[in-house]
Amino acid sequence: MAVLATLQSIGAMHVAYAADSVDPNTPLPSAHEAARQSSLPAVIVAAPRADSGKERLALPVHTGSRLGTSSLDTPASVETLAGDAIRARGDTTVVDAVTRAAGYANNAAAGNGGTAVSVRGFTGQESITTLFDGTKMFVGAGTVTFPFDTWSVDRIEVLRGPASVLNGEGGMGGVINVIPKAPQAERSTTVLLGVGAYGEKRMALDTTGAVDASRPGGPMLTYRFYLNDDRNNGWLPRGQSHSTAVGGALQLDATPTLRFTLDYDYARQMPTTYFGIPVQNSAYSSALTRQNYNVSDARIAYYDRWMRLKTTWQALPGLTIRNQFYFMLTDRHWHDAESYALQDDGSVARSDYIEILHHQRQVGDRLDATLDGRIAGHRNRFVIGTEFNSVNFVDTSNTPYDGSSVVPQLGFDPGVFASSDATVPVFRTRTNQAAVFTENRLEVTDRLAWVSGLRYDHIDYRRDTFATSSTAATSFSRTFANTSWRTGLVFAMTPDLSVYGQYTTGSDGVGSLITLSQANSAYSLSTGHQWEAGIKQILAGGSADWTLAFYQIVKKNLLTTDPDNPTQTIQIGQQSSRGIEWTGALTLPHGIVVDANFSVLRARYDNFSESVNGVTVSRDGNVPYNVPQQTGNVWLRWAFAPGWNVGAGVRYVGSRYGDTANTVRIPSYILFDASASWRVSHQLALALYLRNLTNRTYVVTSSNSGTQWLLGTPRSGGVTATMTF
């Protein structure tokens, strides 16, 4: 009620705060937009699209700010990947799509949910926040499992740099926001059937339309439903995988200014039970590249359910109120032998016979109001809001994960899972979070805008550890509070060229916040800040665009070994990164479009030590593990004849280190992909996709201090038939 009263008071201020009727989901008509629009759109609009490079900077983005400004007017590095372009390239997973954006590299493994990436020198689910339609599921035990498939995606927006001021704790490196397709009034149904290498079979359905299409004055109730099923025998022994996603939305335009949308998404994944191969001295035998050292009855399963109720109401001219209530459930199960080490006699020792089950439930609500108007004659947009979350997490496992075996490198019987440790409930946690946030954009002049933001988070945490045959039950509670803020300037040098600078702060938990251990309970959140400057430009009347960003991030309060006492851990560590990122898109005559980007960074531990055999060893100056310092992407698309398109792409990921000591060096890699499509008729399109054309053996990520490498998929391909009705 207090929040509603606050919003009512904002409405009362409307008399003194000269307002204009503006959709908060559209850019403010600054110098950039003034040349493009003479009137403002209605409050309820369809989701913007960015299918061509020329549109990417001019359309509003929602991941770098809640202000609804365009990328050109946002003082941050934001990139939009259109869903149609993603699917045209054959990128069926969110990770495949996102790692074509500047600076993002794949770190996905079964242990992190198959969705982890790195960017700007940071890696892990805690440091790169994943959103679904702007909503975050809190990270439990370093794992995020949804969203994962691109079939239902309208677009993916990525932000590079800290985002705590927008989404709370986490996101020191960046944000991935997966935005699903919305219901449309025009009826359309799409069916996809596909087959591919290694026994892949894919089926997908997407349908949308109006329930009351014949209603005089236009429909009020629209729907969207999707279904996707993908199964594969895998490229290595016991490599089967199967995923299913189903969901939809109902959208009610109750009045011209009031909209309700109810969304539900269900996903089931049974990914490949593969944890890589053992290596020594940064090398491995080529004979091991298609070996799977997991047990024969290994099992991994993820189940996710998301329900969201969204309300958008233009309460007054210039005042729009939005609310989203959400309920999410996730259940996960691992049943594996996950660690492998080469022995002196050439055999492979397997350990960590792990069985873990996660049950996570999250209920939350986000309410915000956007007020457009003028302050002393200057155009201003102001957002204020609150967010509440309650998260319950239960961990069941067979800790301390007893079980081991030794097998030959080749021609072995994989055996079955065997551990003397019982699988029992280990702990449960409850996390309650409350936040208040605000953003503001003031046009100081017709060409200069000041953008600022502030967020305060309060988190109450409790963990109950259950009693076992050898340990007593324990409990502890902890409270965290953090304030994040940012300030930035955007200067429009011309209507299509802007330069910007910003300073922002952020925070990360010491590990996953909702599964914080008692050993780490005394520590505060890790904090950080970023300086960033950049330039963005649209060229040739919209046929080309490019961006350039320079940044430096410093993250403090890392856990590090006490240099005077190797048995103690203290929170004084520091990690930093600085770098440059460039993106560009060019539309040429004869149907040729080129998208390209590159990133170069320097990431280092500035103050970080570890205990090695009871001795404190400094890692100062070393590169954080699993962080490539160079990445690059190019994709060329050519519509060489009516209905015909071909595409080709190259992806480069620089070398990385697999350990904090920087003794294990993981090689760089270059991958080549290609696609071709033919629209046979208005109702039918055929497509061919080829991946890793040179059959390059490459490392996706590493574990166990770099002695275990997870290899990527060899050369593969597939064909699809897409029917539209």
Predicted feature residues:
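Extracytoplasmic beta-strand/coil segments of soluble accessory domains associated
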Residues: 63-79, 83, 89, 95-135, ...
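Short acidic/polar hinge/loop motifs at secondary-structure boundaries
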Residues: 135-160, 179-180
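Transmembrane beta-barrel wall of Gram-negative outer-membrane proteins
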Residues: 188-190, 195-274, 298-314, 455
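Gram-negative outer-membrane beta-barrel transporters
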Residues: 552, 571-660, 694, 724
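C-terminal beta-signal and adjacent terminal beta-strands/loops
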Residues: 594, 652-659, 677-725
